[in-house]
Amino acid sequence: MQTKIVTVSVTERLSTVEDIMTLGQVRHMPVVHGGKLVGVLSHRDLLRASLSELGSFGTETRRAFLHAIEIAQVMSAPPITIGPEASVQLAARLMADHRIGCLPVVEGEVLAGLVTETDVLCWVAGVKPDPEEL
């Protein structure tokens, strides 16, 4: 589970998220509103929004389009979540059943972490996570 999580506000624009994902090499971003988790935005969601409307547009037009869209329009909501005591097996099953790449870990109403496909694969392979990412 990753505990250093980059979150984004539900009112933020897709252009900002694209920048954060590119610079931070992040593929999943929990979306918050008023301190509460309300959704998850994945790199796949961002690509889907971009490709559906902008297949033949130039970079400037594409950026203008992404800037005009709020995250709430393309995020997955409500998010599928797990608790901090959930097993890796449960996390893997939920990700497979719902065809999602991450699970926010919520303790009460507080976002405590994020379990990704990579975390599950590392567990299966017996690879210890990078301490810098925890």
Which role fits each region the language model picked out?
Residues M1-K4, S42-I80, A92-A96, T116-L134:
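Tandem CBS (Bateman) regulatory domains
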Residues V8-Q25, V31-H33, T81-R99, V106, ...:
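The conserved cystathionine-beta-synthase
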Residues R27, V32, V40-R44, V106, ...:
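Short hydrophobic beta-strand motif reused across regulatory alpha/beta modules
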Residues L37-V40, V88, L111-L114:
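Glycine-rich acetyl-CoA-binding "A-motif" of GNAT/NAT acetyltransferases
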